[in-house]
Amino acid sequence: MATGTPAHELRELNNEELTTRLREAKEELFNLRFQAATGQLTNNRRLGVVKRDIARIYTVLRERELGLSTNPGGDAA
């Protein structure tokens, strides 16, 4: 079963780790879209899961930008 990363786990990461996760998720989404276009995608559900993970990461970063949550690393955005 394809499951994403819960938001509470993302909130425990610092901004640098979140940015790394975001880059990795975008790369995975690109590869999944390429597989879908060529008919090689075996797990269609993974596309939606990765999209939601990207949205969660953006949400956590925006919460920190607005001061709604704190950065566990202690450094400013």
UniProtKB/Swiss-Prot annotation:
One Pfam family here: Ribosomal_L29
GO biological process: translation
GO cellular component: cytosolic large ribosomal subunit
GO function term, MF aspect, one: structural constituent of ribosome
Record keywords: Ribonucleoprotein, Ribosomal protein
InterPro entries (alphabetical): Ribosomal_protein_uL29, Ribosomal_uL29, Ribosomal_uL29_CS, Ribosomal_uL29_sf
Family stated for the protein in its record: Belongs to the universal ribosomal protein uL29 family.
Identification of the protein by name: Large ribosomal subunit protein uL29
Gene designation: rpmC
